[in-house]
Curated annotation (Swiss-Prot):
Single GO BP term: ubiquinone biosynthetic process
Signal peptide region: none
Protein name: Ubiquinone biosynthesis protein COQ4, mitochondrial
Disulfide partners: none
Description of how the protein assembles with itself and partners: Component of a multi-subunit COQ enzyme complex, composed of at least COQ3, COQ4, COQ5, COQ6, COQ7 and COQ9. Interacts with COQ3.
Cofactor: Zn(2+)
Keywords: Lyase, Membrane, Metal-binding, Mitochondrion, Mitochondrion inner membrane, Transit peptide, Ubiquinone biosynthesis, Zinc
Main localisation: mitochondrion
Mode of membrane association: Peripheral membrane protein
Stored InterPro entries: Coq4, Coq4_euk
Physiological role: Lyase that catalyzes the C1-decarboxylation of 4-hydroxy-3-methoxy-5-(all-trans-hexaprenyl)benzoic acid into 2-methoxy-6-(all-trans-hexaprenyl)phenol during ubiquinone biosynthesis. May play a role in organizing a multi-subunit COQ enzyme complex required for coenzyme Q biosynthesis. Required for steady-state levels of COQ3, COQ4, COQ6, COQ7 and COQ9 polypeptides.
Species lineage: Eukaryota, Fungi, Dikarya, Ascomycota, Saccharomycotina
Pfam families, sorted: Coq4
Length: 335
């Protein structure tokens, strides 16, 4: 009997060990889960009751102070304190890098306006901006612009009113040009890298008036039109980036585009830019209700041949030649 009892206890031993082997890991997992999820539950309850945060601490103020400290730390690496809203002071080597990189990108990717914006500021040397400032100071309208520092936006221009002006007014012509080209005066980038606040405003004014030059000359914003207006700005205002654009940008165009520019539009742009009134002194916001023909005469601006029409005529001629060629080819090809 004793032997039989020992055999039975020995036989049941592995089963108990197996159960114990299952129970111990399960208990450990339960304990670990309770610690993790219980802690998260207690944390959530504390947050709900408002007990998590110290009520005596202004967390928003602390975050603002940390941000301010980071800005100060960054400012300590700059050559000077920012002198106007949005100003990013650059070291001389950074300006050279900005010029090199933006110049390279502008040549190979002229369709990206951001490259043009950076190149414009990188080449806006203080001597050029000071000369432009003196040009404005020598004219009554220019002096008023510098004093009042108007900002050209759709809100200031009242686009809904421009749409209702007589069709012969500059304001209506400008409105129709914006609509046709699908652009807005609100899209002009702010000035960031020019150090002197007055110089920065002058360059901002030049940048914001760019579309007025397009509208009064009826020039589209396609690449040929942009090069033409840049050449006009270079001849009239001496803008370094505009001069570079007028010289280098045509090199990447098709032969027929270069021919149009060199034979028609660049000579017109240089001639008009040298002979017309300094466009930086025009208070364009006050010219919107004037007769556009009279305004062109006052500014000594003559219209160039319509670039859109010339391109359409060229495309129609090419289509006609291709059709004749294909017709002759089919006629001479044996069946």
């Amino acid at each position: 009997m004793l032997r039989l009892s020992l055999l039975r206890s020995t036989a049941t031993l592995p089963v108990k060990c197996q159960r114990r082997g299952l129970i111990l890991p399960a208990a450990a997992m339960y304990t670990l889960g309770s610690l993790i999820f219980g802690k998260e539950a207690r944390l959530a309850d504390a947050m709900e009751r408002g007990e998590l945060h110290n009520k005596n601490v202004d967390y928003a103020k602390e975050a603002e102070e940390r941000t301010e400290l980071r800005i100060r730390a960054l400012a300590n690496t700059r050559p000077m304190e920012p002198r106007y809203n949005g100003h990013v002071p650059l070291h001389r080597y950074e300006k050279l890098l900005l010029f090199a990189i933006s110049g390279w990108n502008s040549f190979f990717h002229p369709e990206d306006g951001y490259n043009i914006v950076q190149l414009g500021e990188a080449t806006a040397l203080p001597v050029f901006l000071e000369n432009l400032k003196q040009t404005m100071l020598s004219d009554s309208s220019g002096r008023r612009i510098l004093k009042e520092q108007p900002n050209i936006t759709t809100e200031i221009l009242h686009m809904d009113k421009l749409a209702k002006l007589p069709h012969n007014t500059f304001g209506y012509v400008y409105y129709q040009w914006l609509k046709r080209e699908n652009v807005s005066p609100d899209t002009r980038a702010p000035v960031k890298f020019i150090d002197d606040p007055m110089h920065a405003y002058i360059f901002k004014r030049y940048r914001q008036c760019h579309d007025f030059y397009h509208a009064i000359t009826n020039m589209p914003i396609i690449i040929e039109g942009e090069i033409t207006i840049k050449a006009l700005e270079g001849a009239n205002l001496g803008v370094p980036m505009a001069i570079l654009g007028g010289i280098l940008a045509p090199l990447r165009l098709k032969k027929v585009q270069r021919k149009r520019l060199y034979n028609i539009y660049l000579p017109w742009a240089v001639r008009t830019g040298l002979s017309c009134k300094p466009l930086i002194n025009v208070y364009w916001e006050e010219m919107l209700e004037k007769d556009v023909t009279a305004l062109r005469k006052e500014l000594k601006i003559t219209l160039p041949p319509d670039l859109r029409t010339m391109r359409k005529e060229r495309a129609a001629l090419r289509k006609e030649i291709d059709a004749k060629y294909n017709s002759q080819k089919r006629a001479t090809t044996p069946a």
